[in-house]
Amino acid sequence: MIDPRARRRGPQLVHLPTWSQLSIATRQHGAVGHGGDFFEIIQHRDGHVSTLLADVCGNGPSAAVPVSRLRWLVRQHLAGGEAPGAVLALLNDAIVAGDEPDLFVTAVCLRIDPQSGSVNVASAGHLGPFIKRASGDAQELLTPTGAALGIMPGQDYPETRLDLDAEDSVVLVTDGITDPLGTASSPLGQAGLLAELARARPAAESICAALIRVTTPIKHDATVVVLKLPRRHRRVTPVRTATKR
């Protein structure tokens, strides 16, 4: 999905097709020209969209080496139609059974119905999704999380379900956004991310740009994935909130 040559030029805004009325945008920065962060997005025949964002242990070329193999596994399991928790469990067992015993990965996986606004989310040691409301408010979904992928076989990854409102955005990030290793004055953290989300303009591309801008310069892999719903009428239950100022 992302041209490796573009990644070597620094942070890049990647425009993805509008699928099932979702507006999707990402921005990604790979440390030292290469990165261990990656994501995949797949549209199913029923119109649902699945995405997985992963952070491979390490930075730079050493983390980038297994990414191509992991991408293949992710695509296979997402395309198979498994629920997010099952996708993570299958990936975990595949990594444990592989030939890289020191490899572990954090990941968040979700499946979204653009028509109803329902979202199912599962996490493997990764930050859960953040929600930017159409009103401008920002929320963190505090999902239960299983173990990082690749540590032990036979792990379970519980799912959380939520219902989104019209024009709400789901925001996925890696820890390069919340805890950068660059020369930013201080780590953004979850609270800072919520504040920046509340201030950001509502377009998916604008959200990506705002989060990268506030944590630049970055010396750690950093990725933002934003999926924005079309106009409808639904609601979302907040957990932790920040109000747009």
Q: Positions of the model-derived regions?
A:
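Low-complexity, intrinsically disordered Gly/Pro/Thr-rich segments
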Residues: 205-215
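PRPP/pyrophosphate-binding module of the type I phosphoribosyltransferase fold
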Residues: 190
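Short, charged, surface-exposed loops that flank catalytic or proteolytic processing sites
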Residues: 81-87, 199-206
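Conserved catalytic-loop aspartate of Hanks-type protein kinases
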Residues: 175
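Cytochrome P450 core scaffold surrounding the K-helix E-X-X-R motif
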Residues: 131-134, 181-185
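… and, occasionally, acidic/histidine-rich disordered N-termini of signaling adaptors
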Residues: 1-170, 216-245
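Divalent-cation-assisted or electrostatically stabilized phosphate/pyrophosphate-binding catalytic cores
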Residues: 193-196
